[in-house]
Amino acid sequence: MSNNYKAGTAINGNDYLLLNIDGNKDCDTDNGFFSGKNFFGGNQTSITHRRHHKMTTKTDRELMSHFESLDFNAIDNIIHRKYTFEKKKYQKILKTLGKWVICTLIGVVVGLVCYCLKESVDQLQSLKLTQVKKFYSTESTIFIPFLVYLGFNLCYGLISGLLVCIFGPMSSSSGLPEVKGYLNGIRISKAFNLKTVLGKLVSLIFSFSSGLVLGPEGPMFHIGAGIGSSMSQFKSKTLKFHLKSFWIFQNDSDKRDFISCGAAAGIAAAFGAPIGGVLFCLEEGSSFWSRQLTWRTFFSCLIATMTANLFLQGFTQQIHDYGVLTFGVSKSYLYTYTELIPFMIMGIIGGLLGAIFVHVNVRVNHWRKKLFANKSKLYKMIEVCVIVILSSVVCFFPALLADCRPISGISGLTPGTCDPGDDSTLILNQFNCAEGYYNPMATLTLTTLENSLQIVFSRSTNIFTAQTLLTFSIFYYVLTIITSGLYVASGIFIPMMLIGSSWGRLIGIFLSKYFTSIDPSIYALIGAASMMAGSLRMTISLVVIIVELTETTQYLLPVILSVMVGKWCGDIFNESIYEHLIELKHIPYLNSQPPNHLRKKTVAEAMSTDVKTLPEIVKVKTALTILETCPHNGFPVVMLPQLHSNSNLNDSNQLSLSLNLNNNNNNNNNNNNNNNNNNNNNNNNNNNNILCGLILRSQLSVLLRRKIFNSPEDLKNIDFISDKGYNLPIDHTEFSQELASKIPPIHELSKLITKEDLDMYIDLRPYMNFAVVSIKNYSSLSEAYQIFRQVGLRHMVVINVFNNVVGMLTRKDLC
């Protein structure tokens, strides 16, 4: 699509528009594999975003407008300054100590949850495989054992899907886009409540045991984030309790940090990788980071990993590196520098396969979303059953048709690894084979993902044929594509690792025929790293997690090399699967760098001009009317020059006149022409519109609910020049507790206001934010984006050269 098309130009019967950003435009989504391609048709808009053109429909922009931003930016007002000045040293120490205590509790709870997940999955898998083995040994036909295997998988899958239906859609999939969105500054309803966390945990237990090709890492990231949110806020809508005494932590900024700690702890406990958990959250999760957050996150990861290890090993005196998933790989073999070339080639293969996976999976999820739109959840349950049946067939019948191989033909096999008496923990599976033989395909498919990875990473040679590994890789690659996004709790980290290790070992087997010193297990490790880099596009955290999982620091260089090459190769075609899922869910996510097209725009071209301003002293009737008629969550507060020019207004008529002058002009929307910045200065002599602060909707609602009003007689005693004589009927502690509580809707607040109250006034100055971030209307939109993103703003007031309010920038104007 050409970038020269003007807005409104029709191309081939469809209205393709070059986006001219204004206050009504929302974020874009990428529906294509290559830039500029429209895969889905319809009326769409193309804009430049980082590497590619993104496609977004009007419906997408409307859906994104439903999200609200969080208030990460600290509010600087008079009551907060007074609280800070009077705050004792021991109170600061108690708050710091409280944060460390909460981080400890988060780590302990996440570790216990991880232990419950591991043990529950092992028990369910053991029950299933034991019954399959029992019927296989007693029945003359193979279909009875298959029906038992299928029955267990269907039962587990249905329970997992039903739990999502009961606990809500937030319990499905990985939940990582929602966590990333919240940590970026987006309020996502019900993402971290107790009901969602519990539903996702139990759904993950059954989906992970159902034979579906999925992993626990994404759900554990979400579960950990939910635990961090719940334990730090000391309130729950599900359990209907709220401890106001912990108000000091009940703000968006502290909640964000505790969610980061919990999310990182979830990854750390799942993989037994505390450093990897911290780096995963830093690289892939959190948008705001600090040194203090690094310490607390690492501490939470340490506690979570130790707790999980303690329970998994059974309280013995020795500490092992246990996690939900543990692996082993060769430690004696070292690579040669000539092998770096095939390692780079494997990185390219992993990048290509990862990019194809991202593209096809996004297309499948678009189709899935379109197919099930406005339909009963029964259809989603039917899809779960269909995928479970397909996965069961793929896992069972190829194993039935596979050739048996003698155990004696395996070199380097540890004695006792094929114990027929062991059920769910078999490394080599004797399925459909005589004594002394094993089934290579069943070893990969009729077991847990953990056991499959262990045997693929094993240094023992001649375990698998090239045909087995190729068939397994193709089948699981396709199954992962159609399973990711299913209506159950699921992740893709471990499936990608298993697929990559399979074709990596295949390459190692091929090269070992020509070079006797080749160890296929090392190529399995490099293949796993390449595959994950190609689909997830992580770098540092991925390398550290791989090394911590396999305890193979001697292979750090080839792992880094393959990860970097895989990421670079995948980035040529599309972005990571997580970014595409964010776009698919219409989350207005702000990346660290502004889109390229914003460099050519000014703030005036993007700002919303429908701005409602409030005076420093606002009439109750005016404030109530604005809250009832305007959905905005932030209102610029403008100065009353008539008041500031008279230090003592003892004349009540003069005071009323000064107040009414601004209240009567309050509904002026400051409409300006976005294509002509000079028009923004038409009101440069209007002294009634000078910015002096910002008041939030929630703050204004608290003032109305508490009836913190002033009569004209009360206002006469205030010195508007020196700001002395403020009436402060509520302090910072009480005000913060009110903000943390559930604020009733405006129609309920209006019932509390009497006719006499309507003629009263609200002095906003003690409560409004003096440190409001503003920007000139002629500034670059790219600079506005960076300030907005780095500071974590919810609102950015746009002013002209005379400090007059002319517009407002919000998240949706910058996407």
Swiss-Prot record:
Belongs to the chloride channel (TC 2.A.49) family. This is Chloride channel protein B. Keywords: CBS domain, Chloride, Chloride channel, Ion channel, Ion transport, Membrane, Repeat, Transmembrane, Transmembrane helix, Transport, Voltage-gated channel. InterPro entries: CBS_dom, CBS_dom_sf, Cl-channel/antiporter, Cl-channel_core, ClC. PROSITE patterns: CBS (PS51371). Voltage-gated chloride channel. Chloride channels may have several functions including the regulation of cell volume, membrane potential stabilization and signal transduction. The chain crosses the membrane at residues 97-117, 142-162, 201-221, 262-282, 297-317, 340-360, 381-401, 474-494, 506-526. It comes from Dictyostelium discoideum (Social amoeba). Residues 607-714, 768-815 form the CBS domain. It is a multi-pass membrane protein. It holds the Pfam family CBS. Residues 1-96 are cytoplasmic. It is found in: Membrane.
